[in-house]
From Swiss-Prot:
It catalyses: [ThiS sulfur-carrier protein]-C-terminal-Gly-aminoethanethioate + 2-iminoacetate + 1-deoxy-D-xylulose 5-phosphate = [ThiS sulfur-carrier protein]-C-terminal Gly-Gly + 2-[(2R,5Z)-2-carboxy-4-methylthiazol-5(2H)-ylidene]ethyl phosphate + 2 H2O + H(+). Its EC number is 2.8.1.10. It comes from the Bacteria. Belongs to the ThiG family. It is an enzyme of class 2 (transferase). InterPro entries: Aldolase_TIM, Thiazole_synthase_ThiG, ThiG. GO terms for molecular function: thiazole synthase activity. Homotetramer. Forms heterodimers with either ThiH or ThiS. This is Thiazole synthase. Keywords: Cytoplasm, Schiff base, Thiamine biosynthesis, Transferase. One of its GO terms (biological process) is thiamine diphosphate biosynthetic process. GO terms for cellular component: cytoplasm. 1-deoxy-D-xylulose 5-phosphate binds at G161, A187, G188, N209, T210.
Length: 262
């Protein structure tokens, strides 16, 4: 199967996972291992990756030699805050350029503020960041972000942490069809079938956190999500049969049937 390519780098796994909301770093480690993910996203404002030398660091549980870190701007509500946060991340991670940009509109819905997101993306791309960007499922905004130079566009399936699944597959399909950079569903996945549907639509990957960390058994759910993403990708590549309302053809041979007459 073809690898996922982001900013010129190849990844075998098409599942990206967050690192927040777990009981501790050990549970984080076990869940990430079970997911098979190679890219892990981390909220710079909430997680210790070296800011506090006296506290446990995520870097010890998930060594950068094994995983690609994707610093994100969770908790940022303005372009300026997001830019400042990612500049700090680059310092903490020794010049790391691959980042996830998210600028939120409000604290209740966590819906993206697209105008502020575009403003931040323009600055970050000019500064040499490789920007993977969280956005709405608006195809026009998605295309604008690609044109700015973002290396991946990450439309929501539904609101962050809602677990509502894919609410607007039609808009996602338009984005997938129009963009040339990877399209990664980010936010709203609740269970394995949601991840499979996203991949069957043709998404290049799926990113999730709460769907795994919020499960009764996060490690088992991580394993389920790994399989779901793989199954969805294979189904997309295989090509599904056409949908039919009632003109179905029998799946069993029709020749050589035993006559019903005596």
């Amino acid at each position: 199967m073809q690898p996922l390519i982001i900013a010129g780098r190849s990844y075998a796994s098409r599942l990206l996972v967050g690192t927040g909301k777990y009981q501790d770093f050990e549970q984080t480690r076990l869940a990430v291992e079970a997911s098979g993910a190679e890219i892990v996203t981390v909220a710079i404002r909430r997680t210790n990756i070296g800011q506090d030398a006296g506290q446990p660091s995520l870097l010890d549980a998930l060594p950068p030699s094994k995983y690609t870190y994707l610093p994100n701007t969770a908790g940022c509500y303005t372009a300026e805050d997001a830019i400042r946060t990612l500049r700090l991340a680059r310092e903490l991670l020794d010049g790391h350029a691959l980042v996830k940009l998210e600028v939120l509109g409000d604290a209740e819905s966590l819906y993206p503020n697209v105008a502020e997101t575009i403003k931040a993306a323009e600055v970050l791309v000019k500064e040499g960041f490789q920007v993977m960007v969280y956005t709405s499922d608006d195809p026009i905004a998605a295309k604008q972000l690609e044109d700015i130079g973002c290396v991946a566009v990450m439309p929501l399936a539904s609101l962050i942490g809602s677990g509502m699944g894919i609410l607007n597959p039609w808009n996602l399909q338009i984005i997938i069809d129009r963009l040339t950079v990877p399209v990664i569903v980010d936010a709203g996945v609740g269970t394995a079938s949601d991840a499979t549907i996203a991949m069957e639509l043709g998404c290049d990957a799926v990113l999730m956190n709460t769907a795994i960390a919020g499960a009764s058994d996060p490690v088992l759910m991580a394993s389920a999500m790994k399989k779901a993403v793989e199954a969805g990708r294979e189904a997309f590549l295989a090509g599904r049969m056409p949908k039919k309302i009632y003109r179905a053809s029998p799946s069993s041979p029709t020749s050589g049937l035993i006559s019903g007459s005596k």
